[in-house]
Amino acid sequence: MRVLILSAFIACATAAPSAPVFGTLTPLTVPYIANIPTISPGDIQAAAIDAKVKVEDALRAAADRNQELLEQAIENQNEKVIEVNDLLKEKSQEAFWSTEDTKWQALTALQTAEAKIDGTLASNADLLGKAVLNGVVVSPVVSRIYSNVIQGVAAADCETPVLKAAEAPEGNKDEGNKDSVQVESSATESESDKAAAGFVRNLEAAQAAAQAQLLSETSAPTADTRAVIAASSEASAAAAPAASLSEASAQSASETGVSAASLSQSPVATPLSAAPLAPLPSSSVPLAGVPASAIAAAPLTAASLIASPLTLPTLNLEQQWVTGPVFVQPGLKAISPISLQTPFVPTLLKTPC
């Protein structure tokens, strides 16, 4: 390149006129250039390598710049995706806990409502009990004996005595062992005798109270009424020991020879055989489960009662039904159910209004 420039400069210098154009012509002399400057191939190759390196550096810098921009874009996109995922996860957790909170609030409200209902039922338990059964459950001692004495006891004032059966110690329930049954029967007989004596005293007191109530509400009783009351008292006194010992007598009947026919020879039957017992008054309300035939049955005599085995009404606590002649007097408070699965002792209780 330098050689070309230098050659052009020399040509221009030699071509320029140094005198007038149409003057004397002088011979042109061209000086001889001994050494023309030249460029070595190494310099040219070095320049080419230098240019190539510069181009490669520029291309590498551009590629690095593009790579950085691409990585930054990818990083920004990843950050946005992570941020969006975190936001969605946070919203999902908020929705979940909001649902759980709503569920617990509903459960708390339900428990509060149940507690209020239970409290209301507990505070109105007496009213609910009276609404279910508004009366006193009177269980006669002897089946199908309906007398004015027991009716008077049930229809007395709020402080009236009420007959209720209390459980005595259980006898032996193993019927497969005869010896153990006999031992338990003898023990039950002694306890039943004591219970029967106490029952007779309580029954006499109840009869006296009922008789006084009847005398205060009605006119003077006639001789027939007094005979009926006396007959009922003696029949109950004779029936209580037999009723409490009926189970033991049935178990040991084959050994002792005692039967219902032998009871008919008792001297108690003689003065009471002609005195029928008074039927149940029409004001009594029978419980559900009591057969109508038992209510409408004809009055029995003391002799027929003594000649037949004495039975007691039973109460099934699981099924809530009553069998036997059990009646309710309206207007009085109900008493608790009575279980007659074991030998029992009727006691005299008072139930306030």
UniProtKB/Swiss-Prot annotation:
Region described as Disordered: spans on this chain: 166-195
Transmembrane feature ranges: none
Biased composition (Polar residues): 179-189
Signal peptide span: 1-15
Keywords (A to Z) from UniProt: Cuticle, Signal
Chain's role: Component of the cuticle of the pupa of Galleria mellonella.
Name of this chain's protein: Pupal cuticle protein PCP52
